[in-house]
């Protein structure tokens, strides 16, 4: 007989994301789009462009993972139910009378519930991406990590293409150059689930899914309540960067000291030259007098 813990984690891993968790994911993605400057005005002027941008926010991870695996990028359009659901949320979020959806979403408990449910879908996307990549490239670590990362956090990455098309792309906002917390934690999850998939991490998948989801939800809710950009592994990042890439900074003070010593020796030799020249002149004068 299985333990209650295993029964709980196994039942959790079998939870369907449709429709409630998918609705939360679409709602958070669309509301993040609406809060961007000029997004509401663009929806009134050009609804088709706004709808396309919303679909990129909702399905960007799946599109990017398809591109990496050389699959049709528009395969997400084949799921009519999810497209209609995401389109309905986009419509009521931008065109609801009296802006009722935005007013309801402004309450903190609603935001916490939606954000927590969205983090649950992130775990499912990472696991799905890693498993799907493993079916193409057996035990291909790099491919599995890349596809799991793309499916879990590809929405924020692929929207850079949308900003480039609209002409409002900014290099300093590039996700590859300055990774956000969701991108970092998704990369971490992709690495962990890749190790589990390749049997290098001795833990069952359903237990790992439960523990990682609890970590994601707890961290996200804490960040929203405290309104701080809390990064749980910032100390680990700093220590690892110093160990692997901080050697040049450690040796730079030694180089500066050697440079100062050489410059001091150079000035000393330059000052000794006039003294030597003066002594030579004195010797010449003395020899002339004796003559």
Swiss-Prot record:
Broad class of where this protein is predominantly found: endoplasmic reticulum
Q: Which GO terms describe its biological process?
A: bone development; bone mineralization; cellular response to caffeine; endoplasmic reticulum organization; establishment of localization in cell; extracellular matrix constituent secretion; lung alveolus development; lung epithelial cell differentiation
Task: List residues binding a 1,2-diacyl-sn-glycero-3-phospho-(1D-myo-inositol-4,5-bisphosphate).
Answer: 118, 122
**Activation/inhibition comment:** Channel activity is activated by increased cytosolic Ca(2+) levels and blocked by luminal high Ca(2+) levels.
Q: Which UniProt keywords apply?
A: Endoplasmic reticulum, Ion channel, Ion transport, Membrane, Phosphoprotein, Potassium, Potassium channel, Potassium transport, Transmembrane, Transmembrane helix, Transport
Q: Which residues lie on this side of the membrane: Cytoplasmic?
A: 34-47, 101-103, 157-179, 226-291
Which stretches does UniProt call biased (Basic residues)?
A: 282-291
Q: What does the record give under GO molecular function? A: identical protein binding; potassium channel activity
Q: InterPro entries annotated for this entry?
A: TRIC_channel
Q: Polar residues compositional bias: what residue ranges?
A: 261-274
Keyword check for Cell membrane, yes or no.
Answer: no
Question: How is this protein annotated for GO cellular component?
Answer: endoplasmic reticulum; endoplasmic reticulum membrane
Give me the Lumenal side stretches, as residue ranges.
1-15, 70-80, 123-138, 197-207
Q: Which residues cross the membrane?
A: 16-33, 48-69, 81-100, 104-122, 139-156, 180-196, 208-225
Mode of membrane association: Multi-pass membrane protein
Q: Does the keyword Ion transport apply?
A: yes
Renumbered residue ranges of the record's region Disordered = 257-291
Tell me where in or outside the cell this protein is found. Answer: Endoplasmic reticulum membrane
Q: Which reaction does it catalyse?
A: K(+)(in) = K(+)(out)
UniProt cross-references to PANTHER family, sorted A to Z:
TRIMERIC INTRACELLULAR CATION CHANNEL, TRIMERIC INTRACELLULAR CATION CHANNEL TYPE B
Q: State the oligomer form and interacting partners.
A: Homotrimer; conformation seems to be controled by binding to diacylglycerol (DAG).
> Could you tell me what this protein does?
Intracellular monovalent cation channel required for maintenance of rapid intracellular calcium release. Acts as a potassium counter-ion channel that functions in synchronization with calcium release from intracellular stores. Activated by increased cytosolic Ca(2+) levels.
**Which family is it part of?**
Belongs to the TMEM38 family.
Descriptive protein name:
Trimeric intracellular cation channel type B
